[in-house]
């Protein structure tokens, strides 16, 4: 029985994909695999038998990636599974920042007892007049799964879209509208655009990237939208930019005491991926990733180990090895096999930074003694006999 612990509520449509060989109600201390959404894992003591963690979502800043890699725990995420939900959320943010719908709604609530509210509304509505987004310039920083959807949707709404992503993948480029103007210097986004939306991960290089220097380059009355990660925007600096008129509105999906209730700021309670469809998609994708890894040893959509997809094993045996990305380990792995008289039918090795992953399909079964000898090799982190 394979024990799975769910640190957060995971959609049943995903959990239903586990076969009878899985126990999806296991305690964390007994878990072979973990499903998580937002639970913070940095201070958790990870079980020795833990093989994998799947994040039902894209961001993984709540998971200790390096610690997991050191223990041979493969961490997965579900890129793109919630992309449409976040895209729609960003479009809503664009409209909320352009048309004072929230102010209008509040006026109606405050005047609900007015017998002539319809007549009064005709006089009051001029206070909530806004601007149309059609024809305006939108800068999209980050053109991954979400950013490209936002860019394409904004084109359909008649906006002039500028996209910046120095790491743009080939697949993302193919999916991007040809009408999106590719920008090679992010400063051009700051200088040219009426609206700016951010879609990058939280890295040391991106923390506080939207800062005073960026605001100083912006046009008067720029709208900034952050539905990506809370640390990307220097929020004290953006409050100053709002006071000076550089920024007309700041829409953020990350509530905190700095921005909540501030003039010119629309704070949403982290609703970007909070749709039934997104939660279902993320759960299904996360469970499939876990099963593929546990049952076949394949790594797809990992964030701390290299992707390595060898399909279903058709040989007599398959062993997988998480190891350090250092010279001579491959020769040592094959030497152990050769000394044991085990023929290697096929082998794949992939690396990512300091870590690597090897899959060996063999002509005969892998014994416990062979697995132990593989584990004893210097630099090997975890050995698992899959078949």
Predicted regions and their residues:
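An N-terminal-biased, well-structured beta-alpha scaffold segment characteristic
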Residues: 1-79, 211, 217, 223, ...
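Rossmann-like adenosine-cofactor binding region
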Residues: 39-45, 166-259, 274
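Phosphate-binding beta-alpha-beta segment of Rossmann-like dinucleotide-binding domains, i.e.
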Residues: 79-137, 301-303
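Oxidoreductase and adenylate-handling cofactor-binding alpha/beta cores
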Residues: 87-106, 154-159, 285-298, 334-338, ...
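Glycine-rich Rossmann-fold phosphate-binding loop(s) that bind the pyrophosphate
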Residues: 143-144
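N-terminal Rossmann-fold NAD(P) dinucleotide-binding loop
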Residues: 147-148
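Rossmann-like dinucleotide-binding domain for NAD(H)/NADP(H)
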Residues: 212, 220-313, 357, 387
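A conserved regulatory-domain signal marking ACT and ACT-like small-molecule sensing domains
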Residues: 300-387
């Amino acid at each position: 029985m394979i024990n799975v612990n769910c640190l957060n509520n995971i959609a049943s449509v995903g959990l239903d994909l586990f076969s009878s060989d899985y126990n999806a109600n296991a305690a964390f201390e007994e878990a072979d695999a973990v499903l998580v959404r937002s639970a913070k894992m940095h201070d958790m003591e990870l079980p020795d038998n833990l093989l994998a963690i799947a994040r039902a979502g894209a961001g993984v800043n709540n998971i200790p990636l390096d610690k997991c890699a050191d223990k041979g725990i493969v961490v997965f995420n579900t890129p793109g599974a919630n992309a449409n939900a976040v895209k729609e959320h960003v479009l809503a943010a664009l409209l909320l920042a352009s048309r004072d719908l929230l102010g209008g709604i509040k006026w109606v609530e405050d005047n609900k007892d007015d017998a002539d509210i319809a007549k009064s509304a005709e006089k009051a509505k001029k206070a909530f007049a806004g601007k149309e987004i059609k024809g305006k310039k939108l800068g999209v920083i980050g053109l991954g799964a979400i950013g490209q959807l936002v860019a394409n949707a904004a084109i359909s709404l008649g906006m002039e879209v500028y996209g910046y992503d120095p790491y743009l993948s080939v697949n993302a480029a193919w999916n991007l509208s040809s009408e999106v103007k590719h920008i090679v210097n992010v400063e051009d986004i700051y200088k040219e655009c009426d609206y700016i939306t951010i879609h990058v991960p939280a890295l040391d290089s991106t923390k506080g990237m939207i800062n005073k220097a960026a605001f100083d380059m912006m046009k008067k009355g720029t709208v900034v939208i952050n539905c990506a990660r809370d640390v990307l925007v220097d929020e004290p600096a953006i409050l100053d930019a709002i006071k000076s008129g550089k920024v007309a509105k700041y829409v953020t999906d990350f509530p905190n005491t700095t921005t909540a209730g501030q003039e010119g700021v629309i704070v949403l309670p982290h609703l970007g991926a909070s749709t039934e469809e997104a939660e279902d998609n993320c759960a299904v994708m996360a469970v499939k990733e876990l099963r593929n890894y546990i049952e076949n040893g394949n790594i797809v959509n990992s964030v701390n180990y290299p992707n390595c997809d060898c399909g279903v094993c058709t040989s007599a045996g398959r062993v997988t090895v998480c190891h350090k990305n250092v010279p001579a380990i491959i020769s040592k792995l094959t030497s152990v096999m050769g000394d044991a008289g085990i023929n290697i039918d096929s082998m794949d090795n992939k690396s990512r930074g300091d870590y690597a992953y090897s899959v060996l399909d063999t002509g005969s079964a892998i014994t416990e003694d062979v697995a132990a000898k593989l584990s004893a090799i210097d630099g090997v982190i975890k050995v698992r006999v899959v078949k």
